[in-house]
Amino acid sequence: AYGLGLKGKNKNFDGSISFEQIVELYLFNANFRQLLFTWIEQIEVNLRCRVANHFSHIYGVLGYEDPDNFNDPGYHYDFLCEIKKEISRNSKAPFVKNFKNNYTDGKIPFYALVELFSFGTLSKFYKNMKPQDKKAVATLYGVGYTYLESWVEHIAFVRNICEIGRAHF
Protein backbone atom coordinates (compact mmCIF):
# COMPACT_ATOMS: atom_id res chain seq x y z
CA ALA A 1 0.00 0.00 0.00
CA TYR A 2 2.85 2.40 0.75
CA GLY A 3 4.12 2.30 -2.82
CA LEU A 4 0.77 2.92 -4.51
CA GLY A 5 1.19 6.69 -4.53
CA LEU A 6 4.62 6.32 -6.08
CA LYS A 7 3.45 4.62 -9.26
CA GLY A 8 3.34 6.57 -12.50
CA LYS A 9 0.42 6.99 -14.93
CA ASN A 10 1.22 3.63 -16.49
CA LYS A 11 0.77 2.05 -13.02
CA ASN A 12 4.42 1.02 -12.87
CA PHE A 13 7.15 2.30 -10.60
CA ASP A 14 9.46 4.81 -12.18
CA GLY A 15 13.06 3.64 -12.21
CA SER A 16 14.01 6.17 -9.55
CA ILE A 17 11.87 4.51 -6.83
CA SER A 18 13.69 1.98 -4.68
CA PHE A 19 12.48 -0.58 -2.19
CA GLU A 20 14.41 1.33 0.49
CA GLN A 21 12.35 4.46 -0.24
CA ILE A 22 9.14 2.50 0.24
CA VAL A 23 10.49 1.13 3.54
CA GLU A 24 11.40 4.69 4.62
CA LEU A 25 7.85 5.79 3.79
CA TYR A 26 6.49 2.94 5.89
CA LEU A 27 8.75 3.86 8.83
CA PHE A 28 7.82 7.55 8.54
CA ASN A 29 4.15 6.62 8.64
CA ALA A 30 4.64 4.30 11.63
CA ASN A 31 6.40 7.08 13.58
CA PHE A 32 3.79 9.65 12.52
CA ARG A 33 0.97 7.31 13.62
CA GLN A 34 2.64 6.82 16.99
CA LEU A 35 3.04 10.57 17.46
CA LEU A 36 -0.61 11.20 16.55
CA PHE A 37 -1.76 8.41 18.83
CA THR A 38 0.22 9.88 21.75
CA TRP A 39 -1.39 13.30 21.27
CA ILE A 40 -4.86 11.84 20.78
CA GLU A 41 -4.48 9.75 23.93
CA GLN A 42 -3.83 12.93 25.95
CA ILE A 43 -6.90 14.58 24.44
CA GLU A 44 -8.96 11.46 25.14
CA VAL A 45 -7.99 11.26 28.82
CA ASN A 46 -8.66 14.97 29.32
CA LEU A 47 -12.04 14.88 27.58
CA ARG A 48 -13.05 11.69 29.38
CA CYS A 49 -12.35 13.34 32.76
CA ARG A 50 -14.16 16.56 31.92
CA VAL A 51 -17.24 14.81 30.52
CA ALA A 52 -17.41 12.41 33.49
CA ASN A 53 -16.97 15.23 35.99
CA HIS A 54 -19.60 17.48 34.43
CA PHE A 55 -22.16 14.77 33.75
CA SER A 56 -21.83 13.17 37.21
CA HIS A 57 -22.00 16.57 38.92
CA ILE A 58 -25.21 17.56 37.09
CA TYR A 59 -27.05 14.21 36.91
CA GLY A 60 -25.46 12.06 39.60
CA VAL A 61 -23.18 9.07 39.22
CA LEU A 62 -25.97 6.92 37.76
CA GLY A 63 -27.44 9.70 35.63
CA TYR A 64 -26.39 7.88 32.48
CA GLU A 65 -29.26 5.42 33.09
CA ASP A 66 -31.95 8.10 32.60
CA PRO A 67 -32.84 8.83 28.95
CA ASP A 68 -34.19 12.25 29.97
CA ASN A 69 -30.60 13.36 30.65
CA PHE A 70 -29.78 13.18 26.94
CA ASN A 71 -30.59 15.13 23.82
CA ASP A 72 -31.94 12.07 21.96
CA PRO A 73 -33.56 9.58 24.34
CA GLY A 74 -33.98 7.16 21.41
CA TYR A 75 -30.22 6.76 21.10
CA HIS A 76 -30.03 6.11 24.83
CA TYR A 77 -31.22 2.48 24.55
CA ASP A 78 -28.47 1.72 22.01
CA PHE A 79 -25.96 3.39 24.32
CA LEU A 80 -27.01 1.23 27.29
CA CYS A 81 -26.75 -1.93 25.15
CA GLU A 82 -23.25 -0.91 24.08
CA ILE A 83 -22.29 -0.24 27.70
CA LYS A 84 -23.61 -3.63 28.86
CA LYS A 85 -21.42 -5.30 26.24
CA GLU A 86 -18.38 -3.33 27.44
CA ILE A 87 -19.07 -4.23 31.08
CA SER A 88 -19.39 -7.89 30.13
CA ARG A 89 -16.25 -7.78 27.98
CA ASN A 90 -14.32 -6.13 30.85
CA SER A 91 -15.87 -8.17 33.66
CA LYS A 92 -12.44 -9.20 34.96
CA ALA A 93 -11.16 -5.62 35.26
CA PRO A 94 -10.51 -4.89 38.96
CA PHE A 95 -12.73 -1.81 39.15
CA VAL A 96 -15.63 -3.59 37.40
CA LYS A 97 -15.33 -6.55 39.79
CA ASN A 98 -15.16 -4.13 42.72
CA PHE A 99 -18.47 -2.46 41.87
CA LYS A 100 -20.16 -5.75 40.96
CA ASN A 101 -19.05 -7.47 44.19
CA ASN A 102 -19.16 -4.67 46.75
CA TYR A 103 -22.31 -2.73 45.94
CA THR A 104 -25.75 -4.23 46.34
CA ASP A 105 -27.06 -3.13 42.97
CA GLY A 106 -23.73 -3.77 41.22
CA LYS A 107 -24.13 -0.62 39.16
CA ILE A 108 -21.02 1.18 38.02
CA PRO A 109 -20.91 4.95 38.63
CA PHE A 110 -20.36 7.06 35.55
CA TYR A 111 -16.93 8.31 36.61
CA ALA A 112 -15.75 4.66 36.53
CA LEU A 113 -17.92 3.51 33.63
CA VAL A 114 -16.44 6.13 31.32
CA GLU A 115 -13.11 4.28 31.60
CA LEU A 116 -14.65 1.49 29.51
CA PHE A 117 -15.61 3.87 26.70
CA SER A 118 -13.72 3.72 23.45
CA PHE A 119 -12.96 7.15 22.04
CA GLY A 120 -15.77 6.53 19.53
CA THR A 121 -18.21 5.83 22.37
CA LEU A 122 -17.01 8.93 24.20
CA SER A 123 -17.56 10.94 21.01
CA LYS A 124 -21.11 9.56 20.61
CA PHE A 125 -21.83 10.19 24.29
CA TYR A 126 -20.73 13.81 24.00
CA LYS A 127 -22.75 14.22 20.81
CA ASN A 128 -25.90 13.01 22.61
CA MET A 129 -25.46 15.23 25.67
CA LYS A 130 -27.95 18.07 26.04
CA PRO A 131 -26.79 21.31 24.38
CA GLN A 132 -26.30 23.09 27.72
CA ASP A 133 -24.08 20.23 28.93
CA LYS A 134 -22.04 20.16 25.73
CA LYS A 135 -21.66 23.91 26.05
CA ALA A 136 -20.43 23.61 29.66
CA VAL A 137 -17.76 21.07 28.65
CA ALA A 138 -16.75 23.02 25.53
CA THR A 139 -16.39 26.20 27.60
CA LEU A 140 -13.63 24.43 29.57
CA TYR A 141 -11.70 24.33 26.28
CA GLY A 142 -12.62 27.88 25.30
CA VAL A 143 -14.58 26.84 22.19
CA GLY A 144 -18.19 26.55 21.07
CA TYR A 145 -19.78 23.15 21.58
CA THR A 146 -20.44 22.61 17.87
CA TYR A 147 -16.71 23.00 17.23
CA LEU A 148 -15.76 20.62 20.03
CA GLU A 149 -18.34 18.08 18.85
CA SER A 150 -16.93 18.18 15.32
CA TRP A 151 -13.32 18.03 16.51
CA VAL A 152 -14.01 15.07 18.79
CA GLU A 153 -15.74 13.20 15.97
CA HIS A 154 -12.80 13.82 13.63
CA ILE A 155 -10.22 12.95 16.26
CA ALA A 156 -12.06 9.65 16.87
CA PHE A 157 -11.82 8.95 13.13
CA VAL A 158 -8.08 9.70 13.05
CA ARG A 159 -7.56 7.59 16.18
CA ASN A 160 -9.20 4.63 14.47
CA ILE A 161 -6.89 5.06 11.49
CA CYS A 162 -3.90 5.12 13.85
CA GLU A 163 -5.12 1.99 15.57
CA ILE A 164 -5.54 -0.08 12.41
CA GLY A 165 -2.25 1.12 10.96
CA ARG A 166 -3.38 2.81 7.75
CA ALA A 167 -1.21 5.40 6.03
CA HIS A 168 -1.88 9.04 6.97
CA PHE A 169 -0.20 10.90 4.15
What does each model-found stretch correspond to?
Residues 2-168:
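Long, contiguous internal "core" modules enriched in hydrophobic/ aromatic residues
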